[in-house]
Amino acid sequence: MTRSLKKGPFVAAQLMDKINKMEASGKKDSITTWSRASTILPTMIGHTFAVYNGRQHVPVFVTDQMVGHKLGEFSPTRTFRSHIKKDKKSKR
């Protein structure tokens, strides 16, 4: 189920406060956040977010194509280890 239109997109209140402070000051520093569920809004375009993936903060630069997606989509939580075929000839 999608979110109700009358509610609007979810963005953490403390994250919006940080964005508003950054825009008021005119700085372009990285904004550290643990809120992976926050939706990317048009006001976030051009900002860099350090999104926590459970181990470290991954830098995410927001572009106009990311609007409507969640911040957590751009900081993967799992590292993929490729399925390596064992070379049986090298064992002998």
Curated annotation (Swiss-Prot):
TM spans (from-to): none
Protein name: Small ribosomal subunit protein uS19c
Similarity comment: family membership: Belongs to the universal ribosomal protein uS19 family.
GO BP field: ribosomal small subunit assembly; translation
Gene Ontology CC terms: chloroplast; mitochondrial small ribosomal subunit
The organism's place on the tree of life at top rank: Eukaryota
Pfam name, any one: Ribosomal_S19
Signal sequence, renumbered to the chain: none
Reported function: Protein S19 forms a complex with S13 that binds strongly to the 16S ribosomal RNA.
